[in-house]
């Protein structure tokens, strides 16, 4: 290896240490982890593709690091010169290298966070003040509630065992990493964690280092790009893989920790195994709003698949339980059941089992009971498998478990018997874990929500009323619709027969209801209606459930997402509750979903956040008035523009009384991996949600003072006006947006099964919130997040400078306002208007340059005003750890941004001149066929060879670097 290459290799480490010069604490190993992964990767890169490629990567990195230090745009031009001189194969290798290095930096961060957390637990306290505000350790929370708020242990226990957090996994098209890679990333994390363990021998260290290099190389050699869009079944399988990997075992482990925390505050009883603390639901295969690929058949398949997976997971554990429960003493109640089972069981039915394959003798009573449970689980799985494969099964339903009570009954019997015989400690072992899994996951693993647009139900109702000859439902007033729906709901006659004339769309809606009727009711959760505005939207779904013979109707959940819908939501709910039939039907419980994405796209983050806050307060008041317990279902995205942000803070900043021990929240696309990708991440997620929900209920945040509200109302009007004047009223905004961002190329990423537009060839209104945010995140300009804040602050400060004091008081005393400001501050820390200016220079027509300049001036002004309100001199001065992590990531992202901007230029402007230099990459397999082979992976591209793949790799890399996509 040449001498200068060695110098360069050390210089990347040196650059890293320049970016993050000093350790933030004794347990700060981030730069160490990052440097190790980077060194290993660069050695692998050199072995695979030669010294020249390694040097080019290092040159780009160093120029990017220099840009980050000096913010000199000349550096960006220099990176551009290096990148445009590459041939297509080299271009792909270099881009892939940066994308890969960013992923390694993320993995180093995760290992560092886990390491600091372990140190914290050993010390028994928070590492620093910051983590106290962003972490929610369950034990810490219980102690705080008792000591600071003087709650009794019993009060805490009662609140905890009655609360529910329902996490709803959605396949939103934002998980841009393939599963093949996610698994390799998990193994890299494990190797890195073990390498830094205290008691490791030199031999183990060497073996781990080799394993680490193997995994880094395997990940680098895997195609990052999905070559076909995932189907809803693919998305469902990907989501379910997290249950298999972490959630399944993570839940009982977490509940044991809750038991320990309770014991430490003086509660000598465990959480009841059926306490519904954590529940899981899913939208994968149930969310048909704007996704024509989710058909009734797919919904049916997804439910059967989930049942099969659940039975598989139980089957894998039941024999361990049989080994554990080898006792012969049992209660009389259990003995009766054992004798009955023993008499009726056949001797040769268990040959297909590995363990306990002969009939179990009655002298092992628990094993007799569990053997019967095992048979039923086997049949449950096989029946689901047959139905999935052919739609038919010879296994009768009565030989399977059809509902969770049937499944729990024999397990509860074993538990009671063990306790009665003095073996409670045995009962509280694996059996308790198993009972908790059954209570949490049931037979369906997750409950599937159905989501459909209200218009689709109106179409069905219209077809029915036309068929009955009573006019057009669509043209009726709301009063007339309600009157007719209620008379039908109160009546007994069927509404229509098989001869109802149906278009494909109408058949699709009705067939979905038939699937709900056909499958076991525990497969389903809520029926969510998007674009719901009136009581008739909800009543129509109730009537369709009855007409299609849904035995146990799903609860109907209206979803309010646009700003105007949120404003009108309380009145809509009051009208719904005033319908006596409906009040009798819901039994004092209602769920309402509020959408963060569309409200943000519609009015900007400031106004959306404030309107969501006020809407929740008003909805809760309406529910109180009618004596209804309201559960809020939060449709949050991963990005700040779509309502994302740290879980703990997001929950604690909700209005008082809006959570009250029951919370539903979506865990979307890219956030699933960050929440459940590893055992410790899964544990942390469950802990954060549980602790923050408990704290919000027992120690609600303060209500805003009247003068704060008045100021917020005034600012929201100004913020909305500015946001809309630019996004919707500026005549050339859409043109600028499409030129200055990769929005038009987004669809090529094959991220999700859902189209990125509701209607082709329309403006911003029809663009889904996800690609809208994705495009601005890619250029690091984040316009939807900050636009409006600056105008709002400027307006109230110009009006009266004393308002600055009020705003600072709001920031220091009101959690909602603080979280809103802190999240935007974090986005500014990730943003870079210099990068956005490069996109403008290369991609936007000259007559629009002044528009981009104006937006960037607005960005800078907003940032300064935000810092003034927060009382900060620099961005993130209160969170040095996050600041350090972002500094380390920035150089990689900058190199990818420059590459992306030039790729877009080459794709969009065929006349753009580039002068490729000599081919750099050497490939060890065949010197005649180097990296150019990579170009052939994409056979469908309409662009010049290699351009599309390079562009997609930049999108994925930047998404990994921003740690959120859409």
UniProtKB/Swiss-Prot annotation:
It catalyses: oxaloacetate + phosphate = phosphoenolpyruvate + hydrogencarbonate. It comes from the Eukaryota. It is found in: Cytoplasm. It is an enzyme of class 4 (lyase). The keyword Ligase does not apply. One of its GO terms (molecular function) is phosphoenolpyruvate carboxylase activity. GO terms for biological process: carbon fixation; leaf development; photosynthesis; tricarboxylic acid cycle. This is Phosphoenolpyruvate carboxylase, housekeeping isozyme. It comes from Saccharum hybrid.
